[in-house]
Amino acid sequence: DYRTIPGFYFFAASYHSESRAKLFAEQIYDLMRSHGGGNMRLAVDRLSFIATDALREKRLELVDGEAVSEHARAVKSEEELELMRASMAVCEAGCKSMEEALEPGITENALWAKLHETNIRMGGEWIETRLLSSGPRTNPWFRECSMREIERGDLVSFDTDLIGPYGYCSDMSRSWLCGERPSDEQRRLYAAAYEQIETNIAALKPGLTFRDVSERCWKIPDEFLSNRYSVLIHGVGLADEYPSIKHWVDFEKKGYDGEVVPGMTLCVESFIGSEGGREGVKLEEQVIITETGVERMSTYPYQIDWL
C-alpha cells in the first residue's frame, strides 16, 4: 500500500496547512480502519499540533510513541553493535586526525574541522554539536568551538557527538594538552575526571537499577559539584537516547528508575572543573552492557602519564 502524504508543513502548504493536514488525517484514519483490527490507538513520536488535532478529529486515540521508540532502541541487536563499532572506528580516526593537527595557533574551529573531514571522507553523516573548547573556554563546559587560537599550555577538551556510517552515534570525549608537559593543576583535574570515569564504568552491571548505579557512582568532591556534567550516564544509538541516569545528588528531583540490561549501549560522562577555575577536563567513554559486565566501545588512549 503506497500513498503520497500531502505536505502540511508551512513551507510546502503555506496557509493551506490545516486543510492538507485533514487530508493526511483522512489517509491515516483509512489505514487504521482497514488494517488496525478495530484498534484506533496510534503511537505518535513527532507531529505538529495541526496534524495532531486533525487526527483526533477522526477519533483516533493518540499515545506517546517516543516512549515506545526509546525503549525499543535501548537494547541493540548484534547487527546494530557491528554498525556502531564501525561508526566508532571512524570517530577515533577523526580524533587521531585532530590530535595530530593540534599545535599552537590553530583555531578551535580548524581543529574541529578535522573530525568533520574524517567522518565525511570515511562515509559518515554529520556531527550533532560543536563541543570543542580550549584554555579558559573549557570551564564551565558546553561552549561551542570558536575562532579562538589555541595557545601553548592550553587544555583542549571535546565531545564528539558524531553520527558516523550507517547513522549510528559515536559519543566519546577526551582532553589533551597543546604542549609537552601539563601543569600540576591540569594533572589534578585530569586525574579526578579519569577516576570518575573508571569508578562509574566499574559500577555498571546488568540487573542493577538506575538508582543502584547512581548510588554506587563516584562521589564528586564539593569543589567540582556546581560545574558537574548534567548526567552520569546516558544511552546512545542513533543519537543520545534513553536512559538518562542522574547524579545521586539530583536523583530524587530529576531522576527516574529502570534497569540496566545486556545489549544497552551507554556513555559514561565526566566533567571536572572548579567554579571560577581556569580550565576543565571532559572525558567520556562509550560501553556495551554484556551478560557479565561491560565492554568498551571507545578505545582512544587516555593521558595515562598524567596520572
Task: Label each residue range with its predicted role.
Residues 1-307:
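Active-site neighborhoods and metal-handling regions in enzymes and metal-associated proteins
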